[in-house]
């Protein structure tokens, strides 16, 4: 299955994104989600195929969610993910001697 998607970012939550079918835009996104998400800011459009890889999401799950519910919500990474990627010298900066 191929689908041209529009990706929107949240102005309220860093690294939170909405994937929607470009033709439907935000028409199937519930108002209850848009309130905490904030006014969606269009980032880019892309062609999603099962072969395509996304940095932090499973493309099959994204396509399935868009088909079933009209959108896919990408949550920000957890704090643990940020910490795991910090260089060791930054992790030790505030350690007591």
UniProtKB/Swiss-Prot annotation:
According to the entry, every stretch annotated as the YcgL domain falls at 3-87
Task: State a single Pfam family of this protein.
Answer: YcgL
Question: What is the name listed in the Swiss-Prot or TrEMBL entry for this protein?
Answer: YcgL domain-containing protein PSPA7_4096
């Amino acid at each position: 299955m191929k689908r041209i998607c529009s990706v929107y970012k949240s102005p309220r939550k860093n690294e939170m994104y909405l994937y929607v079918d470009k033709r439907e835009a935000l028409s199937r996104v519930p108002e209850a989600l848009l309130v905490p998400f904030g006014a969606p800011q269009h980032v880019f459009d892309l062609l999603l195929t099962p072969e395509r890889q996304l940095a932090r999401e499973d493309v099959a799950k994204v396509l399935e969610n868009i088909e079933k519910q009209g959108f896919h919500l990408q949550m920000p990474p957890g704090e643990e993910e940020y910490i795991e990627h910090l260089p060791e010298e930054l992790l030790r900066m505030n350690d007591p001697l």
